[in-house]
Structures are given as C-alpha cells and as structure tokens.
C-alpha cells in the first residue's frame, strides 16, 4: 500500500468517526469500466468501509474490474435497462462508447475524432436486466452511473433499490451523441421530481468542434460543452424526511466524496439538533 493510499484511507476513517457513521455504505457503479478516472468512492471501498457493486455489460471490461477491486466488490456482467431485449452497439473497448443506443452520426461528426471513437464494430442482440431485479444487492446508498445514454432508463427501473439512496453521480450530456438519448435537462427534471437536488459538477467536459483544432491537439477544447459528471443529493432543504442514518451518510459523502464542507456542516447541524 502506497503512502498516498494510507493517507487517503486514514482520512476516510477520520471522517467516519467525526460523523459517527456506523452503517456500511453500499455503492453501485453502473458502467464501471475505469476509463482514465479514479472514482470518488475508491478509498472508501478499498479501505473496507463500504461495498461496491460494479456493473458493466461489456464483458471485455469484467476481468480488469475483478482484478482492480478483488474482494471489495461484487462485479456483475449485466446490461441494465428496462428488462427487455435490446441491441448493443459495440465500439472499441478503450473508448467507453459501447451503448444500448445507436450513435448519432451527425452529433459525432460535430466533434473532432468522435466519428472514430463512436465507430460501431458490431451489433449484438442482448437481454437487459432491471436494477430492481438484481437479487445480489439490497438497498443502495450511493450510485455512480456512466452508461452512454441509458442513465434515465436504468433509474426509472431501479426505484426500489434506490429508495434509501442519498446521492447519485450521473454523466449527463449537453450535446447528445446517441439517438433518442435524454439530455441534461430531461434528466435534471426527473431527478428533481423524485426528491433529489443538484449539488455540484465534478467534471465538465468540453470538446473542440470539427475541423478546428486547438494547438495541434484535438483533445484541447475551446468552449463547446459536451458532457459533465453531476452530483445529486436528497433535497437538503427537506431534511425532516431523512433518517439520522441517511444524514450521517450525506455528511460523510459531502466531506469525503464531494469536498463540500459547507454541505457537511449543514447535515451535522441537523444531527446535533436531533441529538443523534
């Protein structure tokens, strides 16, 4: 274990003690293939303070996930959606573009190199599974999702498993790269309708527009928005509906995952008022 890893896990332990969190946090990462990112929950799971349910429908990603997390995760090779058969559009493994939605060629061509990233190698008829029908998992407390346009479909078919979920991290699109893909506005309205409020953007991705390239690097953007990772939390204006256990989880995540000390204190003040 590296020194940085030890420090990170000591910080996790300290925050758990500060908020007096006693419950194990169940995390679901749907579309869990690690494409150039370290998830916010990584130190929690690797330290043994939570359990990860890692989903990926692309079987090419499963061995790497099992190697990465070992006994800290239950790795499940499912395409989550509405439980019906769908066509999977299989793209190159390293692009993370494989989807249950057909790539929109006009949208791909708008951005430099995305026609290559979104090139479909083959189409495969697959059976999807509803999140609510996964017997291996119980209640989820934090959900991260990056599933190339299927986020809303999965959420709508997982409301039972999400009934005690306190925070959700979603990839949302400003320019939709797939046909019939819900955009940011549609997802935001639905999340609000089930009692979540937007808290912060963890990352906002911009991309250069074809054919203009910035500094001879097609990955260096100008200003065009492409997509973002947004965090939603249970409505912080309506804490009376939350149990003390849920508030402790929210306080922990706000500090350890989202780097939001003001939100942490907001929840802690409510807990103090309850003498919890």
Spans of features found by a protein language model:
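Phosphate/nucleotide-binding beta-alpha loop and adjacent structural elements of enzyme active sites
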Residues: 1-276
